[in-house]
């Protein structure tokens, strides 16, 4: 996130609207001003716009953010435009307030917009809390994290440095992508819990199965159950054999009894058949009579149909005869109208000829009207051209007078041009001199600053060399001590190997009066001390080289400034035409500035006088061109006027000819039309030239022609229709008479045939034939009924004879005894089946339980082996290990190591190689694992101590380094949070001169990147080193914001 523009309205000491454009400030800027002017308020406004409150201990002053200088009726708000990657957003937040004319408090208002093209598009959110969530998702930092890594409030810049492990963990988890590690832990934990649950379930199932099947006595119980089951099956088999024998015997007796009962039923049915024989005989007679009447009915129906057809055709012939008589009467009436129709045809031809003459007269009248209009238009054009000619003559006279005046004014342009050029040369010479003077003054100031910096760096280099020499001497002394201690250690080891009366391996003596007895454990502290001194010496040597490189660079810059100053003196000598071997003093900047202003004023006046002469010259060209145009227009107007007058004379002659022609047509036309007495309108003589008059006459003639033509066509159409209809009716009547004769002959033939057939079938008349008819369904049903009756009677008679031959007359007396015996055997069989089913189920259950027991045992062993590694891995990842550290915490420790590595690069430069941050060694106390604490390693003392022991200035250096290291570490990760800004409120005043130089140098390095750094400080050296500033000017009516290099 990088701020682009901040707008304040009635916030803190800023009354009204104030805008800060961060894009015009460069990568690093300084906020300066008097105490209480409102410097910190700018950072508070940024935090308020994003999070709704200032950061740090100033979060409680949100009610005081509203300006006390503003009127109660005015609103107070903060608007921040910021970039996030390639996108630009704007957040607007209005403070809550209670207006003077209202009792209720106005709630806080918040909205977020995104830039689209040249406009802003508001991001739709239902509530303010939803908008704040969107802002948080964009920044990916809450207010606590923002004040620890982006905006370091006044007096609280060491928050992250001094935070405990829990607070650091919360901050780092949000800044770094540890979700994957946490997800891995959760996934391993879930799988471990699932595996443990599965194992517990299997163990419970195994205990239950062991209690149910008792695997120790399983085989004995199985053999007992199998023997009992076999015995029951043998008994069941014997019972089923006995039951089959008695059942067969009983079924034979029951079959004989059923046959006797069936014989009784058959005899009763045969008696019923004998009673139904007369009814079926009568039905057979009806069937025979219906079969004879069926062919006669078809013939009778045909005869009736022929009779009906004859009657219908006769009625149609009568109707057609009446229609033909009506058509003949209409034809006679049309023949009587033929003479009148012929007269109308001749009249139609006469009107057609008259229409041609009227159309000619109409065309002539139209031509007269058009020519009259053209003549009137030409007359108006001639009048207009005459007026234009008079106007152009007057303009020509006026332009001649104006040209005489401008000619006298343009005569002075050469003199004024010469004076203007001389002044331009003098001004260019003065500006070049002014530029050289200003550049020389800047180089003198830079050379002095660089000289002071070189002297300071020489002192630092000498100090670094002394430190390095001292560290080298300490290193040599420590090495000598280690060598001496190693010698003593060897002596102690050798002394411990000596035995009484045994020769010494060194001197060969058997007497050992004073063997070495020093403790050999003193070597390890010396070794650690030598390692620390070596590390310190390497750091000091590196720092000395860095200082020497910077000193060399500053000397080169100073030499460059001196060379540029000599070049400027040489250029000024050439400009003033002085001898380069003699010294030429560069004039004072103020004097040469006054000279430039004087020449500029004179040049402006000369330019105005030259512009007047040039303007007169330009104005002279325009009247000359206008005079030429006016004379050309005057000549063109005269020529066009002559053409228009000639055209008007020609039109007048043509108009006279057309009037003579229409007069001739008007004399001829009434004679032809009056002879026919058709055109009724009577017009005056002066209207004969009117187009409407001839148009009305033409329309009247055409109307009469259409009416006559329509009447004649209708007469011809009706006459033709009557002729055609009469011919068609005659042909139709003849055809129907032929059909009537054919039908009558067929009727007589069919009537004789039906009479002969009816006599042969013994029917007296047609009604008896109709009464004897039966439908096909009725006939089929009656025949099927008789056939079924005969077949059923024959079958029952044959079955009765067969059964009487098979059965006897005695009824067995032991049927009840057989039934009782069968019933007893059925009960025994059911008892045996129930016993077999119980034994089989018991045996199956026992076997199934034992198999489940064995399967469960195998599964438990397999699952135990499979889950062991998973459970162990889950315990290790979730902190159930020797160090009691979780996997995500281990990842955060790695990130913290990386942050401190970045931070130490800058901290060692600022502390001249003395301090570097170190992550505390992992340890476990009563409260658990403490792995995110930060310690400070002191290269001068070789000790490691808590960060809280640092002084104020040292704490500030460590906090700045840690904040920058945190930003560097985050930015190196793709997809991480982008930290493009860092805001520091005070803290530089606690640094000494050398530390301040180092801090400013590091900030200069950061300035070369794309990161923005804003600093609030009263340190004067920062104001000279940082070119871009925001100056807060304090007045008794509120503060004002000024940007740029203004002091």
UniProtKB/Swiss-Prot annotation:
SUPFAM superfamilies according to UniProt: P-loop containing nucleoside triphosphate hydrolases (SSF52540)
Keywords: ATP-binding, Coiled coil, DNA recombination, DNA replication, Endonuclease, Exonuclease, Hydrolase, Nuclease, Nucleotide-binding
Signal peptide positions on this chain: none
Protein name: Nuclease SbcCD subunit C
Record-level Gene Ontology MF annotations: ATP binding; ATP hydrolysis activity; endonuclease activity; exonuclease activity
Coiled-coil features, chain-numbered ranges: 178-276, 305-332, 382-410, 521-547, 624-667, 698-729
Reported function: SbcCD cleaves DNA hairpin structures. These structures can inhibit DNA replication and are intermediates in certain DNA recombination reactions. The complex acts as a 3'->5' double strand exonuclease that can open hairpins. It also has a 5' single-strand endonuclease activity.
The organism's taxonomic lineage, starting at the top: Bacteria, Pseudomonadati, Spirochaetota, Spirochaetia, Spirochaetales
Family: Belongs to the SMC family. SbcC subfamily.
Subunit description: Heterodimer of SbcC and SbcD.
GO biological process: one example: DNA replication
Presence of the UniProt keyword Coiled coil in the record: yes
Alphabetized NCBIfam families for the sequence: sbcc
Chain sites annotated for binding ATP: 33-40
